[in-house]
Amino acid sequence: MSDPTRGPILVLGAGAWGTALSVHLARRAQPNMVSLWARDAALAERMAHNRVNSRYLPEIPFPEALLVWASLEDALASWRSRVAGQDGLGLLVLATPVSGLRPLAEAIAKALGPPKDREAVLWLSKGLAVTPEGLLWPNDLVAGPLVSWPRGALTGPSFAQEVARGLPCALTLASTDPVFARQAARACHGGSMRVYASGDLVGAQLGGAMKNVLAIAAGVADGLALGANARAALITRGLAETARLGQSLGAQPQTFLGLATLGDLILTSTGDLSRNRRVGIALAKGQPLAEILSGLGHVAEGVSTAPAIRSLGQAHGVSLPIVQAVCQLLSGSASVAMVLQELLDRDPVDEDPSAHP
């Protein structure tokens, strides 16, 4: 059943997650109210003809209501026209790795200019970018070209394959504007997907970035067969590192116990579908990083995010030993055995993150 309060939604990026979200939203939408654009024009043409994304989700047929675009300009123009003719909030959803956010936002700004009534932008990306201007969060990358657009992050524990299959999940819609967060959450909420609103964009973005780095550490522990105790310790102490850094950034403490941090951390650190965890498992087995990434077939954001998070921690004087360990493994500056021993040999400290770094 369609939701009359939901406006047109255009998902920009036909990877696994962008496709899965499009399929989910289109199952409950009126025809052509949910659209999917693919950067690869040949892929878009195949998807439009075969009604499936054979590259990323070959077993998931597209709902009849889903419209596929090969031209970004045409997709954006059609979306704007449909927003003007419908009630409800119209959403552009940027489903690209962090590295692609700014170019895509710039293309949107060039094609559409300032937002019109009931137009807004979301992103699915999780990470922290190293740029000539410094370390930039997804919000920074999007806000540059789209400064006047209402915007926010849709984040939380969500394996694309499970969302595409219609299995239940719960996500967070975070924005610096709590009112917009609630509006956008309602626009995405429904069916097998629950969406909660949050006004803590800082904490939500940090949680999404940190969990990818910590999942690499959890994967290393699993690859070494260190046991469930070690995995639980890494997840818990990794959460403590996230909370310490979040406190220095002004995030709300409760965010780190929610879906955007703890929920996503548990999923990514334990699930077999986690790309970052698979990177850690392969590192533990001695596989070179370049070989791991070439065989992955998808972007593992934790690889590029780890050194950025380490730099952020150093800038704020926050100790992040697990993040540091992951960086050493990724750079090849230390062996797995050496990194593990360094973590175990650290002096005992108070567990309360406010009592000791």
Regions inferred by a protein language model and the residue ranges of each:
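Rossmann-like NAD(P)(H) cofactor-binding subdomain of soluble oxidoreductases
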Residues: 68-74, 86-168, 184-186
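Short, conserved active-site loop motifs that form the nucleotide-linked donor/cofactor pocket
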Residues: 65-67, 193
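Internal alpha-helical scaffold of NAD(P)-dependent oxidoreductase catalytic cores
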Residues: 21, 111-112, 141-151, 168-255
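Generic structural signal for well-ordered, non-membrane alpha-helical segments
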Residues: 14, 18, 40, 101, ...
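NAD(P)+-binding Rossmann beta1-loop-alpha1 motif at the extreme N-terminus of oxidoreductases
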Residues: 1-60, 67-73, 79, 83-89
